């Protein structure tokens, strides 16, 4: 059972497109570029027989096979592919609510959990100042190495944000995390919020 739903309207639209390719056995491949990041993009491409990847998951549909990229599959949880007609013809839409931020649990690796909380709890607040923070690495038995960007780089309040906001939030959510360290070059104050 796949985590992706392809509506009947989308299936019929895609089946029609595939039939026009004049390639026996052609299907589609669904994947995400840069999954789990703010830059994630969900994509559908033609997939001729033999073009599927070894870790792809086959989703057999009525008229064709949809190949789901194995790496992207967890990020495609609750994804919906739909087709809606309009005055201009119609539009294929892909909604993948977990593409940018994967759902994690306490068994997920620490770096995935840190990234999850950075994207869902920390960065939305920093975005109001035009900033963000990124996980660089987890070192020394549980120290998260972070880097500020945008309006946070060079900001005079970065230390307070790091210790009072980010570190407290992450320590409350991830008990085995021991602390955080900032590796940002704050001498560049060109875009700093404060």
UniProtKB/Swiss-Prot annotation:
<keyword id="KW-0479">Metal-binding</keyword>
<keyword id="KW-0004">4Fe-4S</keyword>
<comment type="subunit">
    <text>Homodimer.</text>
</comment>
<dbReference type="Pfam" id="PF01106">
    <property type="entry name" value="NifU"/>
</dbReference>
<dbReference type="GO" id="GO:0005506">
    <property type="term" value="F:iron ion binding"/>
</dbReference>
<keyword id="KW-0408">Iron</keyword>
<keyword id="KW-0411">Iron-sulfur</keyword>
<dbReference type="GO" id="GO:0016226">
    <property type="term" value="P:iron-sulfur cluster assembly"/>
</dbReference>
<dbReference type="GO" id="GO:0051604">
    <property type="term" value="P:protein maturation"/>
</dbReference>
<feature type="binding site">
    <location>
        <position position="155"/>
    </location>
    <ligand>
        <name>[4Fe-4S] cluster</name>
    </ligand>
</feature>
<dbReference type="InterPro" id="IPR034904">
    <property type="entry name" value="FSCA_dom_sf"/>
</dbReference>
<dbReference type="InterPro" id="IPR035903">
    <property type="entry name" value="HesB-like_dom_sf"/>
</dbReference>
<comment type="similarity">
    <text>Belongs to the NfuA family.</text>
</comment>
<dbReference type="Pfam" id="PF01521">
    <property type="entry name" value="Fe-S_biosyn"/>
</dbReference>
<dbReference type="InterPro" id="IPR017726">
    <property type="entry name" value="Fe/S_biogenesis_protein_NfuA"/>
</dbReference>
<dbReference type="InterPro" id="IPR000361">
    <property type="entry name" value="FeS_biogenesis"/>
</dbReference>
<dbReference type="GO" id="GO:0051539">
    <property type="term" value="F:4 iron, 4 sulfur cluster binding"/>
</dbReference>
<dbReference type="InterPro" id="IPR001075">
    <property type="entry name" value="NIF_FeS_clus_asmbl_NifU_C"/>
</dbReference>
<comment type="function">
    <text>Involved in iron-sulfur cluster biogenesis. Binds a 4Fe-4S cluster, can transfer this cluster to apoproteins, and thereby intervenes in the maturation of Fe/S proteins. Could also act as a scaffold/chaperone for damaged Fe/S proteins.</text>
</comment>
<protein>
    <recommendedName>
        <fullName>Fe/S biogenesis protein NfuA</fullName>
    </recommendedName>
</protein>
<feature type="binding site">
    <location>
        <position position="152"/>
    </location>
    <ligand>
        <name>[4Fe-4S] cluster</name>
    </ligand>
</feature>
């Amino acid at each position: 059972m796949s985590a992706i739903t392809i509506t009947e309207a989308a299936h019929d639209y895609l089946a029609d497109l595939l039939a026009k390719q004049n390639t026996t056995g052609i299907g589609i491949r669904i994947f995400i570029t840069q999954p789990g990041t703010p830059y994630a993009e969900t994509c559908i491409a033609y997939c001729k027989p033999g073009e599927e990847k070894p870790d792809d998951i086959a989703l057999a549909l009525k008229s064709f096979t949809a190949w789901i990229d194995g790496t992207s599959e967890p990020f495609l949880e609750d994804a919906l592919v739909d087709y809606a007609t309009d005055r201009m013809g119609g539009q294929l839409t892909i909604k993948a609510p977990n593409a940018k931020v994967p759902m994690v649990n306490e068994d997920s690796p620490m770096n995935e959990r840190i990234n999850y909380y950075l994207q869902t709890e920390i960065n939305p607040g920093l975005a109001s100042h035009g900033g963000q923070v990124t996980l660089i690495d987890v070192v020394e038995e549980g120290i998260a190495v972070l880097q500020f960007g945008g309006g946070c780089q060079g900001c005079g309040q970065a230390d307070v944000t790091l210790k009072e906001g980010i570190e407290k939030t992450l320590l409350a959510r991830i008990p085995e995390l021991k602390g955080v360290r900032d590796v940002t070059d704050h001498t560049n104050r060109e875009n700093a919020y404060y």
